[in-house]
Structure formats: structure tokens, C-alpha cells
């Protein structure tokens, strides 16, 4: 018995391979974009919270007295 693989089957295999490659590259790109977004958000949030800690909780009077004391 001679088993012949139909042409359509090989084409579907190629298409599946292509789609797998496309999906993996797509997922990698999306993951990188998400990582970039997260890093940007985290850095901005950290800088904002740091500024808030530095300037928000200390009232101007306290900062002025500190400056006078250091002088």
C-alpha cells in the first residue's frame, strides 16, 4: 500500500507553522510592549510618590526651619 500525502495537507502544515511563528512573534512583541508600559508606569509612579514623600508630607514651615538650621 502506497500512502500518498495530499498536497492540501502539506499546505495546511505550512500554514500552521506560519501561524504558530506569527502568534509567537506577536505574543513576544505584546509582552515587550506590556513590559515597557509597566516599567514606564512604575518609574513615573515611583518618582511621583518619592516627590510626594519629599515635599508633600513636609510642610513649607518645616523645610524652611530645616534650611535655617543647616545654615
UniProtKB/Swiss-Prot annotation:
Instruction: Note the superkingdom of the native organism.
Output: Viruses
Q: Which InterPro entries match?
A: DUF5438 (IPR020104)
The protein's name is Uncharacterized 8.1 kDa protein
Amino acid at each position: 500500500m502506497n500512502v500518498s500525502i495530499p498536497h492540501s495537507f502539506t499546505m495546511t502544515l505550512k500554514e500552521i507553522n506560519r501561524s504558530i511563528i506569527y502568534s509567537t512573534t506577536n505574543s513576544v512583541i505584546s509582552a515587550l510592549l506590556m513590559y515597557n508600559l509597566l516599567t514606564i508606569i512604575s518609574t513615573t509612579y515611583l518618582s511621583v510618590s518619592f516627590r510626594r514623600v519629599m515635599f508633600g508630607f513636609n510642610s513649607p514651615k518645616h523645610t524652611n526651619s530645616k534650611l535655617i538650621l543647616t545654615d
